[in-house]
UniProtKB/Swiss-Prot annotation:
Function: Forms part of the ribosomal stalk, playing a central role in the interaction of the ribosome with GTP-bound translation factors.
Species name: Dehalococcoides mccartyi (strain ATCC BAA-2266 / KCTC 15142 / 195) (Dehalococcoides ethenogenes (strain 195))
Record carries keyword NADP: no
Pfam family, one: Ribosomal_L10
Signal sequence residues: none
Gene3D superfamilies per UniProt: 3.30.70.1730, 6.10.250.290
Protein origin, superkingdom: Bacteria
Annotated protein name in UniProt: Large ribosomal subunit protein uL10
NCBIfam families tied to this protein: PRK00099.1-1 (NF000955)
Keywords per UniProt: Ribonucleoprotein, Ribosomal protein, RNA-binding, rRNA-binding
One GO process term, biological-process aspect: translation
Disulfide bond residue pairs: none
Keyword rRNA-binding: yes
Length: 176
């Protein structure tokens, strides 16, 4: 019996270690007073955005943090803690949770977050949530890069277009 419990805890630590290792960012929440249906709704919204959400056992979470290069986040694991994390979009966990909290009367509390190998405050999580998503930022950069190229193409085509107009006018002059 004790072996099975230890085995389950080891599996839980390994899974959490993997989650922490790939997480680009994380938001920590205090889920006291949350009903199961509300927690399910939160999980569903996070999952739709590609964000994982785990309720953590603090001791196991600290062990998992020790197994990664994120050992500095151990202080976040106090009280009832759940973690929303993403391996692809840094903004998504903060944005989804803050949008949910703004549109509901939930008792869920954001207690802090993790970004770029450091803990961030609740205020910094709120600021992070205001940033556009990764896809929007990439499209803005690409649009900014495309504008000068399009302008250059227009400038380079200008003399050729002018020459074509002059030649066409000369042809009409010779015909008529």
């Amino acid at each position: 019996m004790v072996k099975k419990i230890r085995e389950k805890k080891k599996i839980a630590v390994d899974e959490l270690t993997d989650a922490l290792a790939v997480a680009q960012s994380a938001v920590f929440t205090d889920y006291r007073g949350i009903s199961t249906s509300e927690l399910t709704t939160i999980r569903m919204k996070l999952r739709e955005a590609g964000v994982g959400y785990r309720v953590l056992k603090n001791t196991l979470a600290r062990r998992a943090a020790d197994n990664t290069d994120h050992a500095n986040i151990k202080s976040a694991f106090e009280g009832p803690v759940a973690m929303a994390y993403s391996s692809s979009d840094v903004v998504a966990p903060a944005k989804v949770l803050m949008d949910y909290l703004a549109g509901s009367k939930s008792t869920l509390k954001v207690t802090g977050g993790y970004l770029s190998n450091k803990l961030i405050s609740v205020e910094e999580v709120a600021e992070l949530a205001k940033l556009p998503s990764r896809e929007v930022l990439i499209s803005k950069v690409l649009a900014g890069m495309q504008s000068p190229i399009a302008g250059l193409a227009m400038v380079l085509n200008g003399p050729a277009r002018g020459l074509a107009v002059v030649l066409q006018a000369r042809m009409k002059q010779l015909e008529g």
